[in-house]
Design a protein with these regions (language model features):
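"A position-specific structural signal for the A-helix of alpha-solenoid helical repeats
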Residues: 29-40, 74-79, 118-123, 155-166
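Residue-level detector of the short coil/turn that links helix A to helix B
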Residues: 128, 168, 187-188
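Amphipathic alpha-helical segments of tetratricopeptide repeats
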Residues: 14-19, 56-63, 97-105, 137-146, ...
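Alpha-helical adaptor scaffolds
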Residues: 72-150
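Alpha-solenoid helical repeat architecture
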Residues: 22-32, 68-74, 106-116, 146-156, ...
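Short, charged amphipathic alpha-helical surface segments
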Residues: 1-44
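Helix-turn-helix repeat elements of alpha-solenoid scaffolds
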Residues: 2-15, 45-56, 85-98, 127-138, ...
């Protein structure tokens, strides 16, 4: 069970640390905390000026960084919902994916890439970018062939099914979606 007092204490501590250190990274961290308050706390917070300023800061930061590192990739992967679906979001997604390919030798590469792909597949499918979505699903399929990456197989099956469903093969799509749901339930989760 979540302890709201503990969570509030951590949030306050992180904000205090961020305010004490006036560095670009501390300002970015404060902006992320501000955005996450509305995602995990109060959705009405999205209308506040603090949320809008934080959203703008994160978007501007990601646009202004010329060379992304793991840190920028993770920020985009976690905060991609801040960008409206469309060319800008797709461009940032492709930038993150291409940048990650440069880190193939890094031991966390498969996890970072899976996280990025899963977080962006739904918007790609909803916006009709089926070719790019198919490429992302194929990459996930390749990544989940490794036994250490099995946790990513359920979202891969789900999005593969959703893609099949919307591109003209509803029977196969529903079959994959139901399979993903069954696996998820077997692991003790609700879908």
């Amino acid at each position: 069970q979540n302890d709201p007092l503990y969570s509030a204490a951590i949030e306050t501590n992180l904000q205090d640390e961020g305010k004490a250190a006036q560095t670009p990274s501390s300002r970015l961290r404060r902006a992320e905390i501000e955005v996450l308050k509305s995602v995990y706390g109060n959705p009405a917070h999205q209308n506040s000026s603090a949320y809008q300023a934080a959203k703008s800061h994160i978007q501007k930061y990601l646009f202004d960084v010329e060379t992304w590192s793991f840190s920028e990739i993770r920020i985009f992967s976690d905060m991609s919902f801040l960008f409206e679906n469309g060319d800008v979001k797709t461009s940032l997604f492709l930038t993150a994916w291409e940048t990650l390919e440069k880190y193939k030798a890094h031991p966390d590469h498969p996890v970072y890439l899976s996280h990025l792909l899963v977080n962006n597949l739904y918007p790609l499918i909803c916006s009709g970018q089926y070719t790019l979505a198919k490429r992302a699903v194929e990459k996930l399929r390749e990544l989940t062939a490794d036994p250490s990456m099995l946790a990513w197989k359920v979202p891969m099956l789900y999005y593969d099914g959703l893609l099949n469903y919307v591109t003209g093969d509803p029977q196969s799509g529903l079959s994959k979606i139901h399979k993903a749901k069954r696996i998820y339930h077997l692991c003790g989760h609700d879908f």
